[in-house]
């Protein structure tokens, strides 16, 4: 488990740095604060290496944080980066606002993913500011080929990505503010290497994990509408099959 916020940021930076083909990021909240810019900078650096980057963000953050923001516009304007917003806020349809994307994970290539409760903001990544949230993430590494849960997560992402509820976020005009923001994010990456020198080292991913027999991911329906409680049913079924259960949740 990743329990430390600085370690959580370093894992993201290292995973993105080592990506050769693809980076997938899903998050509920993404801010253009210090931690958010760190991740943006890493994504842009990866895109410049011809890594295909896809980012999906919930519509509330899309409305409050991304709308017209020059840093997100810079990110979306970068070649090899695609950005979508799940269920964008529509003030004419307030009844749709309860359908939110709370998924928070990072996938790189076909070898690893990080999944948990951390948003992409100062509250969850690094030690920026006076307040930090306490959260946990699980890191999964597939030693040889794709693991079953990695395939499951990638398939889940593709379904969410292709939903009609997931709308493309585009840079409509590359203004001076956008170009200056892009330059700032590009120049930020060498500073990250100095701030977090561990990402320059070789990581033994296998040594950082514990072998498991199986990892299974559960989810509710993904459409932006009222949903059947599939998760509740699945958890109840699992609780009936074992002698011991451990549940870790930030919400109760």
Residue ranges and their predicted role:
Residues 1-82, 91-103, 108-252:
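Charged, low-complexity intrinsically disordered terminal segments
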């Amino acid at each position: 488990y990743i329990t430390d916020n600085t370690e959580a940021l370093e894992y993201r930076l290292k995973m993105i740095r080592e990506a050769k083909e693809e980076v997938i990021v899903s998050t509920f909240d993404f801010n253009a604060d210090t931690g958010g810019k760190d991740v943006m900078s890493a994504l842009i650096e990866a895109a410049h290496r011809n890594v295909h980057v896809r980012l999906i963000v919930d519509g509330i953050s899309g409305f409050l944080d991304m709308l017209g923001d020059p840093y997100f516009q810079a990110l979306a304007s970068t070649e090899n980066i695609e950005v979508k917003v799940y269920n964008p806020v529509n003030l004419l349809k307030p009844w749709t606002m309860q359908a939110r994307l709370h998924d928070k994970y990072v996938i790189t290539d076909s070898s690893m993913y990080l999944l948990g409760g951390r948003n992409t903001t100062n509250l969850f990544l690094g030690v920026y500011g006076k307040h930090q949230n306490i959260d946990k993430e699980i890191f999964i590494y597939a030693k040889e080929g794709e693991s079953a849960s990695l395939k499951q997560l990638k398939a889940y992402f593709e379904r969410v990505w292709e939903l009609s509820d997931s709308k493309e976020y585009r840079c409509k005009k590359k203004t001076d503010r956008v170009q200056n923001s892009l330059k700032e994010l590009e120049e930020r990456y060498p500073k990250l290497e100095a701030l977090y020198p561990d990402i320059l080292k070789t990581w033994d991913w296998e040594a950082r994990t514990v072998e498991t027999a199986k990892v299974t991911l559960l989810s509710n329906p993904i459409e932006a509408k009222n949903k059947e409680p599939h998760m509740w049913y699945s958890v109840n079924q699992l609780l009936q099959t074992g002698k011991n259960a451990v549940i870790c949740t930030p919400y109760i």
